[in-house]
Amino acid sequence: MDASKSKALEAALSQIDRQFGKGTVMRLGDKGREKMPAISTGSLGLDVALGIGGLPKGRIVEIYGPESSGKTTLTLQVIAEAQRQGGTCAFVDAEHALDPVYAEKLGVNVDDLIISQPDNGEQALEVADMLVRSGAVDVLVVDSVAALTPKAEIEGDMGDHHVGLQARLMSQALRKITGNIKNANCLAIFINQIRMKIGVMFGNPETTTGGNALKFYSSVRLDIRRIGSVKEGDEVVGSDTRVKVVKNKVAPPFKQAEFQILYGQGINRLGEIVDFGVKLGLIDKAGAWYSYNGDKIGQGKANAMQYLRDNKEVAEFLEQKIKAELLGDIKPVAKEGAEVEEESAEQE
């Protein structure tokens, strides 16, 4: 850049700082490159698929899928993880269907959870915006976008046509709330439902409710599906679940994770530790037997999981080791007083 252009640019930058405040505009290189802060999803595989170890703070996330696919369960696990880190969480229950007993079973501290059950969509989004602007909320969940009914629709008669009301409501709210979410460094999760587009002959007929605004404003979009049942004998005790990262602005997208959701327990994290441990060679598998550090820890996956359940320090060590291997930037915890050297991505 020649001297005259450089001088004009500096004059413009100083005028902007005087008029709008320091830091309004800056060079991207002036701000130190920091790792994107994230909150774990409760699933080791999904944390790895997201590329940053969880869902990004200061961003909007959309989780959508069919009924009974695990959308609310996944968000409750995120809330539980955030609370363990000392965070404050809020749940805007537009569906009026949150079960505190189930939430508590998943590890949520229901006494500290802020909950709102609004009367209409405008109230729900206004409450959400006020909570975000307080700067004190780390995770905000809206369950669900489909239940954000505009006031005009509630006050109208059954059968009245209200074309595009909900889409306009979401578009206006997201324009207003996005900047506040970034400034407050709050993770905002919108749960959404699936609808079918009429008359689609080719391609995917599925779409989400509330218009297109949420698709654009979301930094991460997760498509969650139930793909099978977990059985103990003839009894169904959980669901096999697949989550696809269909949009990701903070890491490479289109990855997917598969895990089990056990009824009354949540995501089967120990099962994931066993599977990833075997895949990375941290746990040895010979036939049905699993071994760790040369010692047999169980015959069959269920017994190996029980060993980890009884030996929490081993489970924690393996989890941190797996994260260090797959994410490359998280230091493993020391085991039994021994220093564990961090393995970088280049050494893999």
UniProtKB/Swiss-Prot annotation:
The keyword Nucleotide-binding applies. Gene3D superfamilies: P-loop containing nucleotide triphosphate hydrolases. One of its GO terms (biological process) is DNA repair. It is found in: Cytoplasm. GO terms for cellular component: cytosol. GO terms for molecular function: ATP binding; ATP hydrolysis activity; ATP-dependent DNA damage sensor activity; damaged DNA binding; single-stranded DNA binding. This is Protein RecA. Can catalyze the hydrolysis of ATP in the presence of single-stranded DNA, the ATP-dependent uptake of single-stranded DNA by duplex DNA, and the ATP-dependent hybridization of homologous single-stranded DNAs. It interacts with LexA causing its activation and leading to its autocatalytic cleavage. Belongs to the RecA family. It comes from the Bacteria. SMART domains: AAA (SM00382). Keywords: ATP-binding, Cytoplasm, DNA damage, DNA recombination, DNA repair, DNA-binding, Nucleotide-binding, SOS response. It comes from Saccharophagus degradans (strain 2-40 / ATCC 43961 / DSM 17024). Pfam families: RecA, RecA_C. ATP binds at G65, P66, E67, S68, S69, G70, K71, T72. The keyword ATP-binding applies.
